[in-house]
Amino acid sequence: MNPVLLFILSASVATGALSAAPDGRRSGAASADGAAAPSVAATARTIDFSGLTWNVKSSGSEAWGPGPNRFSDAASNVWVDDAGRLHLAITYDNGVWKSAEVIAQRSFGYGTYRFTIDSPVDGLDPNVVLGLFTWNDDPAFNHREIDIEFSRWGNPLDATNAQYTVQPYTSSANLTRWTLQPGYSASSHSWRWSSRSVAFQSSAFGNQIKQWSYTRRAGIPKPGGENPRINLWLFRGAAPQNGLPVEVIIGRFEFAP
C-alpha cells in the first residue's frame, strides 16, 4: 500500500444508511427498530473524492438514522467543486429537511485517518451534527465506530461543541467533549488507530488545538470491514433552530497506515 493515500475530490454518486442510538447521539448506528439499515443501495450514486469512490446515502421518502433524518443523494446536498473539495449540505425541500452522508467504498483498518475541513464549524446550529467516523454494519465491536463530531446536541447553551468518541458513548471513559474556538476558517482532525490506543488530534494553522488518547485496550475495536464516512445531519431529526440551511466543506481525506 502507498504509505500515504491522499484523497482530493471529483464527482459521480451512491447510497448508504446508518441509524441512531436512542437519543441520536451517534453519527452511525442501528435503525430505530434495532436493525441495521442498508449501507449501500442497489442503485447507488457515487462521487470521487480524495482519490476514493464514495457512496452517497439516500433514504428516499424514509427517515433513517442517525437522527433519524431524510438523507438525500441530490447534487444540492452532496457535490464536489472544481477544486476537488467535498460539499455537504442540509437543505429544505418541499417541506422536508434533507441531510447528507458519504461512505468510502474502501476499508483501511489500523492507521491514521485525517479529515481537513475548509469551512468554520464552531458555530454550527445547535441541532446540526457534523460527523467524521468509521462504521461497519456488523455490530461487533460497537460497529467499529470511532467518531469526531461537531455539535451541541440541541443545547444552544452548551459551551462545548466538539467531541472524540470510541463507541459506545454511554461510557464516560469513551468520550471527551471539548470546544473548537471561533476564528478557524479551516482545521484538520485525525485519529491514529492501533491495537493499543486511539489517539485523536485537532489542529489549525499548523498549531495543535486539542488531543486525547483512548487507551482502554478492551474497548478498542479490531479492524474488520469498517470504512470512513462523513455526514451532516440533524439531531433527533429536528429542524435547525435558526431555520436556515447548512453547508460544510471538506477539503480532503487522507489515510496513512
Which residues does each predicted region cover?
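Localized edge beta-strand/strand-to-loop motifs within extracellular or lumenal beta-rich domains
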Residues: G183-A199
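Short, aromatic/His-centered strand-loop micro-motif at the edge of beta-sheets
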Residues: T165-A186
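Short, solvent-exposed beta-strand-to-loop segments that form ligand-recognition rims
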Residues: A204-N227
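Bacterial N-terminal signal peptides
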Residues: L6-G16
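Beta-strand-rich interaction surfaces with strong enrichment in secreted/lumenal proteins
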Residues: S99-R106, N174-L180, R217-A218
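Positively charged n-region of N-terminal signal peptides that target proteins for export
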Residues: M1-L5
